[in-house]
């Protein structure tokens, strides 16, 4: 027999009931909005600069409005310059990020190896004279290694990075563990940072020009300014021209282009004038020739008429 339904037996869910049958619905996590960088658009800034320049070219512009527009133009040009510099900086960082990482890793490994060697020499029981000589020679190597490390870290982010270390191509020998131990001893004697990297200027003998700059900035304590590119005017003046010189170059280029367009237009007009003159000359030459031919034909017709009076009707 089926059981009869008892409404008293069915009870409502009590407050605080945490059974599986009456589990509360999970609330959606509300994530905070992502911080978006509101950088100005380059095309929008260029459009505003063009509009302001077009407005300043008006002759009937009042003096107070002209002053306001000139200030706005200076602000737009500064914003455009900053935005282009920011984009160039981010592009250079992405381009040379991996090379800088490998160089920094090799330089830190080289520096740590030299520091361990210095501790070993200082703790050794050798003579004081030999110990001092070794420590003095090692101090120079440590200084070079520190400059190399700072070179990889504080190289200007807005300039093309020149690598310090190159990968060594190791040949695969099949001589067993003795060959591998010999290779390790050779790498340690060469003074390289690791098994797969080697200083470039140790073979060429020429350091990058920025190396001496980094060494000088270490003494002056201006490495952070060097990394942000605020010392470019004092260091890399020959590599990158100043903005004023760039503006002059662009102005000169614009003048040359305008002169070329004017000369092209004038040459085109002169060609059209020459062509029209030649056409008129041809027409003037053709006109008397046509008149002569017409006269000759008329005279011939008159002569034929005098000779045959009547034609077929002549009796």
Swiss-Prot record:
Biased segments, Basic and acidic residues type: 245-258, 269-281, 288-301
Main location per the UniProt record: nucleus
UniProt-listed GO biological process terms: maturation of SSU-rRNA from tricistronic rRNA transcript (SSU-rRNA, 5.8S rRNA, LSU-rRNA)
Signal peptide: none
Compositional bias per record (Low complexity), positions renumbered to this chain: 179-190
Subcellular localization, as worded in the UniProt entry: Nucleus, Nucleolus
Residue ranges the record marks as coiled coil: 41-91
Region (Disordered): 1-43, 173-201, 234-315
A Gene Ontology cellular-component term: nucleolus
Keyword line: Coiled coil, Nucleus, rRNA processing
Bridged cysteine pairs (disulfide): none
Pfam families reported in the protein's UniProt record: Efg1
Family statement: Belongs to the EFG1 family.
Record's function text: Involved in rRNA processing.
Protein name as annotated: rRNA-processing protein efg1
Lineage: Eukaryota, Fungi, Dikarya, Ascomycota, Pezizomycotina
Name of encoding gene: efg1
């Amino acid at each position: 027999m089926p059981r009869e339904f008892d409404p008293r037996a069915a009870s409502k869910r009590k407050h605080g009931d945490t059974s599986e049958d009456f589990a509360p619905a999970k609330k959606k996590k509300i994530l905070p909005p992502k911080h978006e960088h509101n950088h100005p658009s380059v095309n929008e800034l260029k459009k505003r600069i063009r509009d302001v320049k077009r407005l300043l070219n008006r002759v009937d512009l009042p003096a107070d409005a002209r002053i306001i527009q000139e200030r706005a133009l200076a602000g737009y040009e500064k914003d455009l310059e900053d935005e282009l510099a920011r984009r160039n900086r981010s592009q250079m960082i992405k381009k040379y990020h991996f090379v800088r990482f490998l160089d920094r890793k090799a330089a830190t490994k080289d520096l740590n190896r030299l520091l361990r060697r210095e501790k070993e020499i200082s703790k050794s029981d050798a003579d004081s004279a030999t110990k001092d000589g070794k420590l003095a020679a090692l101090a120079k190597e440590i200084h070079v290694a520190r400059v190399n490390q700072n070179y990889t870290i504080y190289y200007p982010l807005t300039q093309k990075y020149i690598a310090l270390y190159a990968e060594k191509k190791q040949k695969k020998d099949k001589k067993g563990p003795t060959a591998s131990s010999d290779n390790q001893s050779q790498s340690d004697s060469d003074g390289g940072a690791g098994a797969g990297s080697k200083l470039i200027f140790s073979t060429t003998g020429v350091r990058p020009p920025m190396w001496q700059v980094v060494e000088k900035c270490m003494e002056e304590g201006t490495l952070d300014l060097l990394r942000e590119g605020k010392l470019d005017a004092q260091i890399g003046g020959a590599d990158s021209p100043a903005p004023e010189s760039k503006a002059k170059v662009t102005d000169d280029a614009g003048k040359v282009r305008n002169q070329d367009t004017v000369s092209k237009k004038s040459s085109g007009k002169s060609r059209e004038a020459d062509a029209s003159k030649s056409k008129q000359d041809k027409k003037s030459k053709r006109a008397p020739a046509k008149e002569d031919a017409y006269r000759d034909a008329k005279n011939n017709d008159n002569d034929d008429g005098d000779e045959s009076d009547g034609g077929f009707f002549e009796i």
